[in-house]
Protein backbone atom coordinates (compact mmCIF):
# COMPACT_ATOMS: atom_id res chain seq x y z
CA UNK A 1 0.00 0.00 0.00
CA UNK A 2 2.60 2.57 1.12
CA UNK A 3 5.02 1.77 -1.76
CA UNK A 4 2.15 2.41 -4.20
CA UNK A 5 1.37 5.74 -2.55
CA UNK A 6 5.04 6.77 -2.57
CA UNK A 7 5.34 5.83 -6.24
CA UNK A 8 2.16 7.78 -7.04
CA UNK A 9 3.44 10.87 -5.21
CA UNK A 10 6.77 10.67 -7.05
CA UNK A 11 5.01 10.64 -10.42
CA UNK A 12 2.19 13.11 -9.79
CA UNK A 13 2.59 16.84 -10.39
CA UNK A 14 2.40 17.96 -6.74
CA UNK A 15 2.97 21.59 -7.69
CA UNK A 16 -0.24 21.64 -9.76
CA UNK A 17 -2.19 19.96 -6.96
CA UNK A 18 -0.88 22.50 -4.46
CA UNK A 19 -1.91 25.37 -6.74
CA UNK A 20 -5.45 23.95 -6.97
CA UNK A 21 -5.62 23.32 -3.22
CA UNK A 22 -4.46 26.88 -2.48
CA UNK A 23 -7.19 28.27 -4.76
CA UNK A 24 -9.84 26.11 -3.07
CA UNK A 25 -8.77 27.00 0.47
CA UNK A 26 -8.76 30.72 -0.32
CA UNK A 27 -12.14 30.39 -2.06
CA UNK A 28 -13.75 28.69 0.95
CA UNK A 29 -12.37 31.30 3.37
CA UNK A 30 -13.60 34.19 1.19
CA UNK A 31 -17.05 32.56 0.83
CA UNK A 32 -17.22 32.16 4.62
CA UNK A 33 -16.55 35.89 4.91
CA UNK A 34 -19.28 36.68 2.36
CA UNK A 35 -21.66 34.36 4.22
CA UNK A 36 -21.50 36.56 7.31
CA UNK A 37 -22.80 39.61 5.49
CA UNK A 38 -24.96 38.60 2.50
CA UNK A 39 -28.31 36.86 2.65
CA UNK A 40 -28.59 33.67 0.62
CA UNK A 41 -24.87 32.92 0.84
CA UNK A 42 -24.63 31.20 4.24
CA UNK A 43 -24.20 27.70 2.78
CA UNK A 44 -21.96 28.60 -0.16
CA UNK A 45 -18.72 27.92 1.72
CA UNK A 46 -19.78 24.45 2.90
CA UNK A 47 -20.95 23.47 -0.61
CA UNK A 48 -17.66 24.77 -2.04
CA UNK A 49 -15.65 22.79 0.52
CA UNK A 50 -17.52 19.55 -0.21
CA UNK A 51 -17.24 20.10 -3.98
CA UNK A 52 -13.51 20.83 -3.69
CA UNK A 53 -12.83 17.69 -1.64
CA UNK A 54 -14.91 15.57 -4.03
CA UNK A 55 -13.14 17.19 -6.97
CA UNK A 56 -9.70 16.44 -5.52
CA UNK A 57 -10.61 12.78 -5.07
CA UNK A 58 -11.91 12.55 -8.64
CA UNK A 59 -8.79 14.32 -9.93
CA UNK A 60 -6.65 11.71 -8.15
CA UNK A 61 -8.68 8.92 -9.77
CA UNK A 62 -8.58 10.46 -13.25
CA UNK A 63 -4.85 11.13 -12.96
CA UNK A 64 -4.26 7.37 -12.92
CA UNK A 65 -6.38 6.81 -16.04
CA UNK A 66 -4.97 6.65 -19.55
CA UNK A 67 -6.00 9.86 -21.30
CA UNK A 68 -5.99 7.98 -24.63
CA UNK A 69 -8.72 5.71 -23.26
CA UNK A 70 -10.67 8.72 -21.94
CA UNK A 71 -10.62 10.37 -25.36
CA UNK A 72 -11.54 7.15 -27.17
CA UNK A 73 -14.48 6.70 -24.79
CA UNK A 74 -16.22 9.64 -26.50
CA UNK A 75 -19.38 7.59 -27.28
CA UNK A 76 -19.86 7.22 -23.52
CA UNK A 77 -19.10 10.69 -22.14
CA UNK A 78 -20.39 12.39 -25.29
CA UNK A 79 -23.79 10.70 -25.06
CA UNK A 80 -24.07 11.42 -21.32
CA UNK A 81 -22.96 15.06 -21.55
CA UNK A 82 -24.92 16.09 -24.62
CA UNK A 83 -27.82 13.85 -23.63
CA UNK A 84 -28.17 16.12 -20.60
CA UNK A 85 -27.73 19.32 -22.63
CA UNK A 86 -30.24 18.56 -25.40
CA UNK A 87 -33.44 18.47 -23.26
CA UNK A 88 -32.67 21.98 -22.01
CA UNK A 89 -32.82 23.28 -25.59
CA UNK A 90 -36.54 22.54 -25.78
CA UNK A 91 -37.80 22.17 -22.20
CA UNK A 92 -37.80 25.36 -20.16
CA UNK A 93 -38.61 25.34 -16.44
CA UNK A 94 -40.38 21.99 -16.79
CA UNK A 95 -41.02 20.71 -13.28
CA UNK A 96 -41.39 16.94 -12.89
CA UNK A 97 -41.64 17.00 -9.11
CA UNK A 98 -38.16 16.66 -7.68
CA UNK A 99 -36.46 17.58 -10.98
CA UNK A 100 -36.74 20.82 -12.97
CA UNK A 101 -35.42 20.64 -16.55
CA UNK A 102 -34.20 23.80 -18.27
CA UNK A 103 -34.17 25.74 -15.01
CA UNK A 104 -33.61 29.49 -15.40
CA UNK A 105 -31.41 30.12 -12.36
CA UNK A 106 -30.88 33.86 -12.88
CA UNK A 107 -34.14 34.93 -14.50
CA UNK A 108 -32.36 35.90 -17.76
CA UNK A 109 -33.83 33.25 -20.11
CA UNK A 110 -30.75 31.07 -19.54
CA UNK A 111 -32.29 27.60 -19.42
CA UNK A 112 -29.01 25.70 -19.10
CA UNK A 113 -29.59 24.28 -15.63
CA UNK A 114 -31.18 21.29 -13.94
CA UNK A 115 -32.61 21.74 -10.49
CA UNK A 116 -32.76 18.67 -8.26
CA UNK A 117 -34.36 19.46 -4.93
CA UNK A 118 -32.48 22.49 -3.66
CA UNK A 119 -29.39 21.88 -5.80
CA UNK A 120 -28.61 23.01 -9.35
CA UNK A 121 -26.39 21.43 -11.98
CA UNK A 122 -25.19 22.85 -15.30
CA UNK A 123 -24.59 20.04 -17.85
CA UNK A 124 -22.58 22.38 -20.07
CA UNK A 125 -19.70 22.00 -17.59
CA UNK A 126 -19.58 18.26 -18.27
CA UNK A 127 -20.09 18.89 -21.99
CA UNK A 128 -17.05 21.19 -21.92
CA UNK A 129 -14.80 18.31 -20.85
CA UNK A 130 -16.28 16.01 -23.50
CA UNK A 131 -15.88 18.77 -26.10
CA UNK A 132 -12.17 19.18 -25.29
CA UNK A 133 -11.51 15.42 -25.34
CA UNK A 134 -13.35 14.78 -28.62
CA UNK A 135 -11.89 17.82 -30.39
CA UNK A 136 -8.40 16.85 -29.19
CA UNK A 137 -8.90 13.36 -30.62
CA UNK A 138 -10.26 14.77 -33.89
CA UNK A 139 -7.31 17.15 -34.30
CA UNK A 140 -4.79 14.43 -33.50
CA UNK A 141 -6.25 12.29 -36.30
CA UNK A 142 -5.87 15.07 -38.90
CA UNK A 143 -2.49 16.24 -37.62
CA UNK A 144 -0.56 17.95 -40.41
CA UNK A 145 -3.63 17.93 -42.67
CA UNK A 146 -6.02 20.21 -40.81
CA UNK A 147 -5.80 22.94 -43.51
CA UNK A 148 -7.27 20.68 -46.19
CA UNK A 149 -10.79 21.94 -47.00
CA UNK A 150 -12.64 18.76 -46.04
CA UNK A 151 -10.75 18.30 -42.77
CA UNK A 152 -11.11 21.96 -41.85
CA UNK A 153 -14.85 21.94 -42.58
CA UNK A 154 -15.39 18.89 -40.35
CA UNK A 155 -13.35 20.41 -37.51
CA UNK A 156 -15.31 23.68 -37.80
CA UNK A 157 -18.58 21.73 -37.59
CA UNK A 158 -17.17 19.92 -34.54
CA UNK A 159 -16.65 23.33 -32.92
CA UNK A 160 -19.69 25.27 -34.10
CA UNK A 161 -22.44 22.70 -33.45
CA UNK A 162 -21.74 22.55 -29.67
CA UNK A 163 -21.43 26.36 -29.61
CA UNK A 164 -24.84 26.65 -31.28
CA UNK A 165 -26.38 24.21 -28.79
CA UNK A 166 -25.10 26.18 -25.80
CA UNK A 167 -26.29 29.43 -27.41
CA UNK A 168 -29.79 28.00 -27.86
CA UNK A 169 -29.81 27.21 -24.13
CA UNK A 170 -29.42 30.95 -23.57
CA UNK A 171 -25.96 30.69 -22.02
CA UNK A 172 -23.98 32.95 -24.34
CA UNK A 173 -21.11 33.33 -21.87
CA UNK A 174 -20.40 29.59 -21.90
CA UNK A 175 -20.96 29.51 -25.69
CA UNK A 176 -18.26 32.17 -26.06
CA UNK A 177 -15.89 30.09 -23.92
CA UNK A 178 -16.60 27.01 -26.08
CA UNK A 179 -15.89 29.05 -29.22
CA UNK A 180 -12.62 30.36 -27.78
CA UNK A 181 -11.52 26.88 -26.71
CA UNK A 182 -12.25 25.56 -30.19
CA UNK A 183 -10.34 28.35 -31.94
CA UNK A 184 -7.27 28.05 -29.70
CA UNK A 185 -7.20 24.26 -30.07
CA UNK A 186 -7.60 24.52 -33.85
CA UNK A 187 -4.79 27.08 -34.10
CA UNK A 188 -2.51 24.99 -31.88
CA UNK A 189 -3.48 21.93 -33.93
CA UNK A 190 -1.91 23.35 -37.08
CA UNK A 191 -4.31 25.90 -38.60
CA UNK A 192 -2.31 28.21 -40.87
CA UNK A 193 -1.57 31.71 -39.59
CA UNK A 194 -3.31 33.28 -42.59
CA UNK A 195 -6.48 31.24 -42.13
CA UNK A 196 -6.48 31.95 -38.39
CA UNK A 197 -6.04 35.71 -38.86
CA UNK A 198 -8.55 35.85 -41.71
CA UNK A 199 -11.12 33.78 -39.85
CA UNK A 200 -10.76 35.86 -36.69
CA UNK A 201 -11.09 39.14 -38.61
CA UNK A 202 -14.05 37.86 -40.61
CA UNK A 203 -15.76 36.64 -37.44
CA UNK A 204 -15.36 39.97 -35.65
CA UNK A 205 -16.35 42.14 -38.63
CA UNK A 206 -19.14 39.81 -39.70
CA UNK A 207 -20.53 39.55 -36.17
CA UNK A 208 -20.47 43.33 -35.69
CA UNK A 209 -22.13 43.90 -39.07
CA UNK A 210 -24.82 41.32 -38.36
CA UNK A 211 -25.67 42.91 -35.01
CA UNK A 212 -25.71 46.37 -36.61
CA UNK A 213 -28.11 45.21 -39.33
CA UNK A 214 -30.21 43.02 -37.05
CA UNK A 215 -29.96 44.32 -33.47
CA UNK A 216 -32.95 42.17 -32.58
CA UNK A 217 -30.61 39.17 -32.45
CA UNK A 218 -29.58 40.41 -29.02
CA UNK A 219 -32.02 40.13 -26.16
CA UNK A 220 -32.92 43.40 -24.48
CA UNK A 221 -30.86 42.78 -21.35
CA UNK A 222 -27.84 41.71 -23.47
CA UNK A 223 -27.91 44.95 -25.45
CA UNK A 224 -28.17 46.93 -22.21
CA UNK A 225 -25.19 45.09 -20.71
CA UNK A 226 -23.05 46.09 -23.70
CA UNK A 227 -24.20 49.70 -23.37
CA UNK A 228 -23.45 49.53 -19.64
CA UNK A 229 -19.75 48.98 -20.38
CA UNK A 230 -19.68 51.93 -22.80
CA UNK A 231 -21.74 54.29 -20.61
CA UNK A 232 -21.48 53.07 -16.99
CA UNK A 233 -22.82 56.37 -15.58
CA UNK A 234 -26.00 56.47 -17.68
CA UNK A 235 -28.94 56.83 -15.23
CA UNK A 236 -31.21 54.96 -17.64
CA UNK A 237 -29.02 51.87 -17.16
CA UNK A 238 -28.72 52.13 -13.38
CA UNK A 239 -30.34 48.74 -12.79
CA UNK A 240 -27.89 47.09 -15.23
CA UNK A 241 -24.73 48.93 -14.19
CA UNK A 242 -25.32 48.67 -10.43
CA UNK A 243 -23.45 45.39 -9.87
CA UNK A 244 -20.51 46.28 -12.13
CA UNK A 245 -20.23 49.78 -10.65
CA UNK A 246 -20.19 48.31 -7.15
CA UNK A 247 -17.58 45.77 -8.25
CA UNK A 248 -15.31 48.43 -9.72
CA UNK A 249 -15.76 50.54 -6.58
CA UNK A 250 -14.88 47.57 -4.38
CA UNK A 251 -11.67 46.91 -6.33
CA UNK A 252 -10.71 50.59 -6.29
CA UNK A 253 -11.15 51.03 -2.52
CA UNK A 254 -9.34 47.85 -1.45
CA UNK A 255 -6.02 49.61 -1.06
CA UNK A 256 -2.83 47.64 -0.48
CA UNK A 257 -4.04 45.13 2.13
CA UNK A 258 -7.84 45.52 1.97
CA UNK A 259 -10.62 46.01 4.51
CA UNK A 260 -10.01 42.61 6.10
CA UNK A 261 -11.86 39.29 6.00
CA UNK A 262 -14.88 38.96 8.32
CA UNK A 263 -14.62 42.67 9.19
CA UNK A 264 -17.99 43.62 7.69
CA UNK A 265 -16.50 46.88 6.42
CA UNK A 266 -16.33 45.97 2.74
CA UNK A 267 -18.13 47.62 -0.17
CA UNK A 268 -21.39 45.74 -0.81
CA UNK A 269 -21.32 43.87 -4.14
CA UNK A 270 -24.56 42.03 -5.07
CA UNK A 271 -24.13 38.25 -5.35
CA UNK A 272 -20.43 38.59 -4.60
CA UNK A 273 -20.07 34.82 -4.23
CA UNK A 274 -20.59 34.25 -7.94
CA UNK A 275 -19.30 36.28 -10.91
CA UNK A 276 -17.96 39.12 -8.75
CA UNK A 277 -16.00 37.21 -6.13
CA UNK A 278 -12.78 38.80 -7.43
CA UNK A 279 -14.14 42.29 -6.70
CA UNK A 280 -15.06 41.27 -3.14
CA UNK A 281 -11.71 39.56 -2.68
CA UNK A 282 -9.82 42.64 -3.92
CA UNK A 283 -11.79 44.77 -1.48
CA UNK A 284 -11.18 42.66 1.64
CA UNK A 285 -7.63 41.50 0.81
CA UNK A 286 -6.48 44.49 -1.22
CA UNK A 287 -3.91 44.60 -3.98
CA UNK A 288 -1.80 41.96 -2.22
CA UNK A 289 -4.65 39.43 -2.09
CA UNK A 290 -5.82 40.18 -5.64
CA UNK A 291 -2.27 39.80 -6.96
CA UNK A 292 -1.89 36.49 -5.10
CA UNK A 293 -5.06 35.15 -6.77
CA UNK A 294 -3.86 36.24 -10.20
CA UNK A 295 -0.45 34.62 -9.61
CA UNK A 296 -2.11 31.34 -8.55
CA UNK A 297 -4.38 31.25 -11.60
CA UNK A 298 -1.63 32.30 -14.01
CA UNK A 299 0.70 29.64 -12.60
CA UNK A 300 -2.04 27.03 -13.00
CA UNK A 301 -2.65 28.06 -16.62
CA UNK A 302 1.05 28.00 -17.47
CA UNK A 303 1.59 24.66 -15.72
CA UNK A 304 -1.24 23.16 -17.76
CA UNK A 305 0.25 24.49 -20.98
CA UNK A 306 3.73 23.30 -19.97
CA UNK A 307 2.39 19.78 -19.36
CA UNK A 308 0.96 19.73 -22.88
CA UNK A 309 4.15 21.00 -24.49
CA UNK A 310 6.15 18.26 -22.75
CA UNK A 311 3.80 15.52 -23.96
CA UNK A 312 5.30 13.47 -26.80
CA UNK A 313 2.01 12.80 -28.61
CA UNK A 314 -0.50 15.11 -30.28
CA UNK A 315 -3.53 13.93 -28.31
CA UNK A 316 -2.09 14.76 -24.89
CA UNK A 317 -0.83 18.11 -26.14
CA UNK A 318 -4.23 18.97 -27.65
CA UNK A 319 -6.05 18.04 -24.43
CA UNK A 320 -3.81 20.25 -22.31
CA UNK A 321 -4.14 23.14 -24.76
CA UNK A 322 -7.93 22.83 -24.54
CA UNK A 323 -7.96 22.81 -20.75
CA UNK A 324 -5.49 25.71 -20.70
CA UNK A 325 -7.82 27.62 -23.04
CA UNK A 326 -10.83 26.94 -20.78
CA UNK A 327 -8.98 28.15 -17.68
CA UNK A 328 -7.41 31.17 -19.36
CA UNK A 329 -10.54 32.37 -21.16
CA UNK A 330 -12.72 32.08 -18.06
CA UNK A 331 -10.17 34.04 -16.04
CA UNK A 332 -9.82 36.79 -18.66
CA UNK A 333 -13.57 37.17 -19.24
CA UNK A 334 -14.40 37.14 -15.52
CA UNK A 335 -11.71 39.69 -14.70
CA UNK A 336 -12.91 41.84 -17.61
CA UNK A 337 -16.42 41.78 -16.13
CA UNK A 338 -15.10 42.75 -12.68
CA UNK A 339 -12.94 45.56 -14.10
CA UNK A 340 -15.86 46.89 -16.17
CA UNK A 341 -14.19 46.38 -19.55
CA UNK A 342 -16.44 43.50 -20.65
CA UNK A 343 -20.22 43.07 -20.29
CA UNK A 344 -21.57 40.71 -17.64
CA UNK A 345 -22.14 37.37 -19.39
CA UNK A 346 -22.18 34.95 -16.47
CA UNK A 347 -18.66 33.51 -16.71
CA UNK A 348 -17.32 32.45 -13.31
CA UNK A 349 -13.77 32.62 -11.93
CA UNK A 350 -12.32 29.06 -11.93
CA UNK A 351 -11.95 27.47 -8.47
CA UNK A 352 -13.07 30.68 -6.72
CA UNK A 353 -16.68 31.43 -7.71
CA UNK A 354 -19.27 29.44 -5.75
CA UNK A 355 -20.67 26.52 -7.70
CA UNK A 356 -20.37 22.85 -6.89
CA UNK A 357 -20.70 21.45 -10.42
CA UNK A 358 -18.21 23.90 -11.94
CA UNK A 359 -15.63 23.21 -9.20
CA UNK A 360 -15.93 19.43 -9.56
CA UNK A 361 -15.69 19.63 -13.36
CA UNK A 362 -12.65 21.90 -13.14
CA UNK A 363 -10.94 19.35 -10.89
CA UNK A 364 -11.80 16.65 -13.43
CA UNK A 365 -9.98 18.74 -16.03
CA UNK A 366 -6.98 18.98 -13.71
CA UNK A 367 -7.10 15.21 -13.21
CA UNK A 368 -6.87 14.72 -16.98
CA UNK A 369 -3.90 17.12 -17.18
CA UNK A 370 -2.24 15.14 -14.38
CA UNK A 371 -2.89 11.97 -16.38
CA UNK A 372 -1.08 13.48 -19.37
CA UNK A 373 1.84 14.45 -17.13
CA UNK A 374 2.05 11.05 -15.45
CA UNK A 375 1.92 9.16 -18.75
CA UNK A 376 4.60 11.47 -20.15
CA UNK A 377 6.89 10.71 -17.22
CA UNK A 378 6.17 6.98 -17.54
CA UNK A 379 7.07 7.10 -21.26
CA UNK A 380 10.37 8.83 -20.48
CA UNK A 381 11.23 6.28 -17.79
CA UNK A 382 10.42 3.40 -20.16
CA UNK A 383 12.61 4.98 -22.84
CA UNK A 384 15.48 5.36 -20.35
CA UNK A 385 15.19 1.69 -19.43
CA UNK A 386 15.28 0.68 -23.11
CA UNK A 387 18.36 2.83 -23.72
Predicted regions and their residues:
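Membrane-helix boundary/helix-loop-helix interface segments in multi-pass membrane proteins
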Residues: 1-18, 23, 29-169, 325, ...
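Helix-loop-helix junctions and helix-breaking kinks within/between transmembrane helices
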Residues: 34, 124, 153-186, 213-216, ...
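Hydrophobic alpha-helical transmembrane segments
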Residues: 50-55, 127-128, 283-302
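Transmembrane alpha-helix boundary/anchor motif
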Residues: 65, 134, 208, 217, ...
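Hydrophobic, glycine- and aromatic-enriched re-entrant/interface helices and adjoining loop segments
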Residues: 105-113, 198-292, 312-316
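Interfacial segments of multi-pass membrane proteins
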Residues: 139, 176, 181-195, 265-289, ...
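Hydrophobic transmembrane alpha-helices of multi-pass, membrane-embedded glycosylation machinery
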Residues: 175-186, 202-204, 298, 365-367
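Hydrophobic transmembrane alpha-helices and their immediate junctions
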Residues: 288-331
Amino acid sequence: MYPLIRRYLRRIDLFMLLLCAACSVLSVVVLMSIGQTQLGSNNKASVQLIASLLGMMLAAVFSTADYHALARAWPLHGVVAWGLVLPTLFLHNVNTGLLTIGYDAGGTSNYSWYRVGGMTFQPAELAKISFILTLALHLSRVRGQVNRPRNLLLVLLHILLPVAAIHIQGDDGTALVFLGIGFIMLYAGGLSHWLAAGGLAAGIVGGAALLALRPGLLKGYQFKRILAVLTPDDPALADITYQQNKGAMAIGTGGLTGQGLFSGEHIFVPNAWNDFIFAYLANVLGFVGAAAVLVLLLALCLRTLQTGLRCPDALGCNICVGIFAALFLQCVINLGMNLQVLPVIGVTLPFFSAGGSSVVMMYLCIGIVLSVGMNTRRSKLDMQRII
